């Protein structure tokens, strides 16, 4: 934690004058502040610019004293505030930090249609042979980090294997937990059923062939991977973690939700899915329809309306 705070301060110090120069010299009409937001907020408070500042709040921010103080005292200088989920928007409105009429829901830009078409038509034989080497599998995609909660996913799938001994789980991702997860799989004698695949830049062919995507995260925004999966007509099984999955899956009307990180909850959902797998098209269609709201074009249209006060 301390090292990340120090890195954050170093970035601010080295970026202060370059960003100030851009704002004074180039005078952009808008600037969207996202992730590393303290510096542009600080500059906006210290100087008068022609530029309109838009704050993008993602994830599920911890409202510590510093952040709450900074946001509340900067609100009058911020043009608009956008959030990627309606739950987060509602939460921030209740906290009464920003002026309500400045706050908007703005879905993430996740699906690039041109990129999707290119990747779905992948013709590299070595890669396609790798995809074809797996069959009738569940899929999980994302960095191998604490947030994604892979130890829970693996443990629950191992329980599922007691009922369905031929079950297959592919985990596509890289990260600091890879060795620990590999050892967890080995210790439970599940190396013939659970596979971790790294260095995969194109997940769409895997999504097109999978039975369902599983997301076990402890927290997410909407969860980019569930949007991509739904766009590929893949059924989604997700934890009900804050903040976005249950919103995207319409509280279980467009996919399966299970109680986040609760023992046996995912196992039960996998059992249920196996029993009724052929009868879930209505839920998949709803999720597919929802995913179309997250294209770059839809994001562009929504952002344009917000910036031009057309909402």
State what each model feature region is.
Residues 11-15, 33-39, 57:
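Short His-centered aromatic/hydrophobic patch
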Residues 235-239:
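Short hydrophobic beta-strand element within catalytic cores of glycosyltransferases
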Residues 250-252, 256-263, 271-277:
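Conserved acidic donor-binding segment of nucleotide-sugar-dependent glycosyltransferases
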Residues 78-105, 110-117:
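A short, active-site helix/loop in glycosyltransferases that binds the activated sugar's phosphate group
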Residues 6-7, 53-82, 97-98:
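A conserved, positively charged/aromatic
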Residues 265, 279-293:
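A short, well-ordered alpha-helix in the C-terminal region of glycosyltransferases
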Residues 136-159, 167, 176-183:
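A conserved mid-protein helix/loop that constitutes part of the nucleotide-sugar donor-binding site
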Residues 199, 218:
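Aromatic "clamp/platform" in nucleotide-sugar-dependent glycosyltransferases that forms part
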């Amino acid at each position: 934690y301390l090292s990340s705070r120090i890195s954050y301060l170093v970035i601010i110090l080295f970026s202060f004058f370059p960003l100030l120069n851009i704002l004074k010299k180039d005078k952009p009409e808008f600037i969207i502040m996202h992730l590393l937001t303290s510096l542009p907020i600080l500059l906006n408070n210290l100087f008068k610019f022609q530029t309109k500042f838009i704050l993008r709040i993602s994830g599920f921010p911890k409202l510590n004293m510093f952040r709450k103080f900074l946001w509340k005292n900067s609100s009058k200088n911020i043009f608009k505030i956008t959030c990627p989920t309606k739950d987060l928007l509602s939460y921030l409105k209740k906290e009464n930090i920003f002026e309500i009429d400045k706050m908007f829901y703005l879905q993430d830009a996740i699906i690039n249609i041109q990129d999707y078409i290119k990747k779905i038509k992948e013709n590299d034989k070595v890669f396609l042979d790798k995809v074809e080497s797996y069959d009738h599998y569940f899929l999980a995609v994302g960095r191998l980090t604490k947030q994604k909660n892979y130890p829970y996913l693996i443990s629950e799938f191992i329980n599922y294997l007691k009922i369905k001994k031929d079950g297959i789980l592919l985990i596509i991702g890289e990260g600091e937990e890879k060795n620990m997860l590999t050892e967890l799989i080995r210790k439970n004698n599940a190396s013939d059923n659970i596979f971790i695949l790294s260095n995969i830049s194109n997940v769409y062919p895997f999504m097109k062939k999978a039975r369902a995507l599983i997301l076990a995260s402890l927290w997410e925004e909407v969860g980019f991977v569930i949007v991509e999966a739904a766009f590929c007509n893949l059924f989604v099984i997700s934890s009900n973690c804050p903040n976005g999955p249950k919103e995207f899956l319409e509280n279980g009307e467009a996919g399966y939700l299970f109680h986040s990180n609760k023992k046996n909850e995912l196992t039960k959902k996998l059992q249920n899915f196996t029993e009724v797998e052929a009868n879930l098209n209505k839920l998949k269609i709803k999720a597919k329809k929802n995913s179309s709201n997250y294209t770059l074009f839809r994001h562009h249209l929504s952002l344009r309306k917000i910036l031009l006060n057309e909402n």
